[in-house]
């Protein structure tokens, strides 16, 4: 495995010998096996914690949301380690190993009854709670899985993007296709996880159901290592996050400096140590330009490099900061999208657990975790139709290969419709259960199909568009940062959900009846919470239309 410097000549030479689609197949395989394993847990985690650990109510939702958030916020640490020390290859490999150990712990919790509390006969009235040490074992497995996700998520798509030369039109076209097929391939893995593995967990054995994803992670690691001879591996050249803090600090220290015509800016050395020149961005956030102003010749050493890196930063470091700030207005819109998908991953599954799950003439029992499959199938069908049918037809008609713009994809109102539908479906489910006097509503689980399908379309339009926007607008050396920022939006969404749920629970509990506090959804008012989420989606659409859309349509690159 060769390590590539980022100078243009060596970059072009190595790209001729390595990278491209022959490297991508190993990277996508690694991602697919990893996603198959992780979604085998994520898709059924609510069911496992509720049925095997007797968790429920706000505590159950808090555990899942905080874990979701931790998985995603640790992508910042993963991106930092990748950029500053290990590089993307080793960060991906070590992250996969951490996930493997974490999943192994989950397999042990399923195999050893002593690691779990005693089972409950009546799920609506259960007092058998897990001991603190049992929760400690459970949380250690979740923690290792979060660490693994922090290493894999920011680097996988960035490592894949490294395999293409985006300075050419052909390379850019390959990269755009890679985005969609990357999403499609792991969606196929999710379909397998949410059908076969979730079915085994629910109806056959939790032990086998966790051994399978553990084995998948072993395959993910093996496949990734086998392909190492085909990879273009960019050298770790320092953390962009650390540079951003340095720029802010240096600019604040020089806040009284007034730019003039006789000002000298510190360009900094090139990647091979030789002098270089860069064009300074003069139009945005000019305050931070002060960080690269040489106010005293003593700030430079004999080689012309900065002596004090917290007082003098290069023009490139300032540009990196401006790249990040330029994408923030559009990035914020992704948070609302992930708030929506979090509801389906948690409350959607809890709804399914309290509905009639029989299907067909033979009364087949549909696992509640299968409902996430609807979202993934919808997403996969849309991407396949879009890439293989819609675009070729449009090209035949117009003679040009037209695609939906980023602005149009984000403006799709699927999220608003999804939560309104979910709210009315929950009202119907709850009313039927109360009328019937039962924990499980006689309403069929099939009634949840529309809201899960709409959630899949929301992700297909908004999440894929956001991922593409962040990756394309960042320079090559900041692609791991783009991946981390993408998952940071999901992390913030999970923490917002946690805060929102606890605030709603506290406020409504004071009024005498909590909307979300009971383990039995029939005693809650979940539909009101869904309508609040719909309101957040409306506010997000207005924010994008009135403010952020201008940043989505800018043609200027971040490099």
From Swiss-Prot:
GO molecular function, one term: transmembrane transporter activity
Keywords: Membrane, Transmembrane, Transmembrane helix, Transport
Gene Ontology biological process: pollen exine formation; pollen tube growth
Topology within the bilayer: Multi-pass membrane protein
Any matching Pfam family: PTR2
Organism: Arabidopsis thaliana (Mouse-ear cress)
Tissues in which the protein is found: Expressed in flowers.
Top-rank lineage group of the source organism: Eukaryota
InterPro entries: MFS_trans_sf (IPR036259), POT_fam (IPR000109)
Transmembrane segments: 57-77, 92-112, 132-152, 178-198, 206-226, 321-341, 374-394, 404-424, 437-457, 481-501, 529-549
Official protein name in the record: Protein NRT1/ PTR FAMILY 2.8
Annotated GO CC locations: plasma membrane
Signal peptide range: none
Similarity-based family: Belongs to the major facilitator superfamily. Proton-dependent oligopeptide transporter (POT/PTR) (TC 2.A.17) family.
Places the protein is found: Membrane
């Amino acid at each position: 495995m060769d390590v590539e410097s980022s100078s243009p000549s060596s970059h072009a030479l190595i790209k001729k010998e390595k990278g491209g689609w022959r490297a991508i197949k190993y990277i996508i395989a690694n991602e697919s096996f990893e996603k198959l394993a992780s979604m085998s847990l994520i898709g059924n985690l609510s069911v496992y914690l509720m049925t095997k650990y007797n968790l429920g109510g706000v505590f159950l939702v808090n555990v899942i949301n905080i874990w979701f958030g931790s998985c995603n916020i640790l992508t910042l640490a993963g991106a930092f380690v990748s950029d500053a020390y290990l590089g993307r290859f080793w960060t991906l490999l070590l992250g996969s190993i951490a996930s493997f150990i974490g999943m192994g712990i989950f397999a042990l919790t399923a195999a050893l009854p002593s690691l779990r509390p005693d089972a409950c006969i009546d799920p609506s009235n259960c007092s058998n709670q897990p001991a603190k040490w049992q929760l400690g074992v459970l949380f250690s497995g979740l923690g290792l899985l979060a660490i693994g996700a922090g290493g894999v998520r920011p680097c996988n798509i960035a490592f894949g993007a490294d395999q293409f030369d985006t300075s050419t039109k052909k390379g850019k076209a390959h990269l755009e296709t890679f985005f969609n097929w990357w999403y499609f391939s792991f969606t196929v893995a999710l379909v397998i996880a949410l059908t076969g593995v979730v079915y085994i967990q629910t109806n056959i054995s939790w032990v086998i159901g966790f051994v399978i994803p553990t084995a998948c992670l072993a395959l993910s690691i093996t496949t990734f290592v086998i392909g190492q001879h085909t990879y273009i591996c960019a050298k770790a050249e320092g953390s962009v996050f650390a540079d951003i803090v340095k720029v802010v600090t240096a600019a604040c220290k020089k806040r009284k400096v007034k730019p003039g015509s006789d000002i000298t800016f510190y360009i900094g050395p090139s990647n091979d140590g030789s002098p270089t020149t860069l064009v300074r961005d003069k139009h945005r956030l000019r305050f931070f330009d002060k960080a690269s102003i040489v106010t005293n010749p003593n700030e430079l050493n004999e080689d012309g490099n900065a002596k004090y890196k917290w007082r003098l930063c290069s023009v490139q470091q300032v540009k990196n900061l401006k790249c990040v700030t330029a994408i923030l207005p559009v990035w914020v819109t992704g948070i609302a999208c992930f708030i929506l998908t979090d509801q389906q991953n948690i409350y959607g599954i809890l709804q399914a657990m309290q509905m009639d799950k029989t299907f067909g003439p033979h009364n087949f029992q549909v696992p509640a975790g299968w409902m996430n499959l609807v979202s993934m199938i919808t997403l996969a069908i849309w991407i396949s139709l879009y890439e293989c049918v819609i675009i070729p037809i449009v090209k035949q008609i117009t003679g040009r290969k037209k695609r939906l713009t980023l602005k149009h994809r984000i403006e799709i109102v699927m999220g608003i419709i999804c939560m309104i539908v979910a709210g009315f479906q929950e009202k119907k489910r709850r009313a039927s259960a109360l009328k019937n006097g039962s924990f499980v509503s006689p309403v069929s689980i099939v009634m949840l199909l529309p809201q899960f399908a709409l959630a899949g379309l929301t992700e297909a339009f908004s999440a894929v568009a956001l991922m593409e926007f962040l990756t394309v607008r960042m320079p090559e050396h900041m692609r791991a940062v783009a991946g981390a920022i993408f998952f940071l939006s999901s992390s913030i969404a999970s923490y917002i959900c946690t805060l929102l749920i606890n605030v709603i629970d506290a406020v409504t509990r004071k009024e005498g009846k909590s909307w979300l506090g009971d383990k039995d959804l029939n005693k809650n008012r979940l539909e009101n919470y869904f309508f609040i989420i719909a309101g957040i989606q409306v506010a997000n659409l207005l924010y994008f239309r009135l403010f952020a859309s201008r940043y989505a349509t800018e043609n200027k690159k971040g490099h």
